[in-house]
């Protein structure tokens, strides 16, 4: 099989490429240049990362190239990130990158050049079912599982995905293997933050691009309790950094409950008001056919949160998910991954949430 290995400059993608070679595949390494800047200090798309990827490819013994996807990344990921926050929503840029860059733009180019699959260092597994369906499953290591950010992939993409690390029990073993292979990235730290925000201060980064927008912070009773310089700098569930001018009447902490972009208002209140009993919105599937008939499943609303048992069904052309127990601090724009056991059924882009009246 002819494999294009996407090499970020990290240890996971380097070991994945090496394993692809071990399996006898014809492997070519490629680093995606995603930043328009010639400098950078952190993330997965800096000049240093490109150098690390090139060194890893040389150590593995495979051809290596750098492909410029900065224009697509700007449009599909960065601009989307800014517009979503401007609209009071909370996007996941890693998911958008997988959807539009790694397994869309990159995959299309790979197929056009005669490659059979794109190999990445994601911790997930793909199986071919007897009926010809490609199933996306969690990784063997739930601690490192990344199926949440891959749940948006569909059959045409899964058919060409190759995840050599999916059955690896732990990241420690991957680092150990990299060290044994002589890969200098064996001890390189993981990247956890948004790769295109060097400071990791999302609010300040957004403010530089959107501009200052003064507004009010109100409580759930409509009373003004503070002010802000940009509602886009807040997200549902946030507790720290609110700088409220008056304490809560009950003395308990306040959390961001909602962001109203039209009035440029941030609404705060007690944690109980963050409870969500129903999620709904547009959806994609990995091959599963959702219908109006409810199915038992589980839902995961964040990359590193625990799944919650739920039911899912179609209502008025949108996917509705009702967790068996409430989930908290779910923002519009977030993604929810739907599972049956370890299998990923699909992805819900959360447009609406509901809280049922307490009994």
Swiss-Prot record:
Q: Which GO terms describe its cellular component?
A: cytoplasm
The subcellular location is: Cytoplasm
What is a single molecular function from GO for this protein?
Answer: tRNA binding
Q: Which UniProt keywords apply?
A: ATP-binding, Cytoplasm, Disulfide bond, Nucleotide-binding, RNA-binding, Transferase, tRNA processing, tRNA-binding
Q: List residues binding ATP.
A: 6-13, 32, 121
One GO biological process this protein is involved in is: tRNA wobble position uridine thiolation
Chain intervals for the UniProt region annotation (Interaction with tRNA): 144-146
Q: What is the disulfide pattern of this chain?
A: 97-195
Read off the InterPro entries from this record. MnmA-like, MnmA-like_C, MnmA-like_central, MnmA-like_central_sf, Rossmann-like_a/b/a_fold
- The positions flagged as active site in the entry are 97 (nucleophile), 195 (cysteine persulfide intermediate)
Q: What is its EC number?
A: 2.8.1.13
Q: Which reaction does it catalyse?
A: S-sulfanyl-L-cysteinyl-[protein] + uridine(34) in tRNA + AH2 + ATP = 2-thiouridine(34) in tRNA + L-cysteinyl-[protein] + A + AMP + diphosphate + H(+)
Looking at the UniProt record, the site noted as Interaction with tRNA sits at 122, 334
* Purpose: Catalyzes the 2-thiolation of uridine at the wobble position (U34) of tRNA, leading to the formation of s(2)U34.
By sequence similarity, the record places it as follows: Belongs to the MnmA/TRMU family.
Q: What is the name listed in the Swiss-Prot or TrEMBL entry for this protein?
A: tRNA-specific 2-thiouridylase MnmA
- What organism is the protein native to? Tropheryma whipplei (strain Twist)
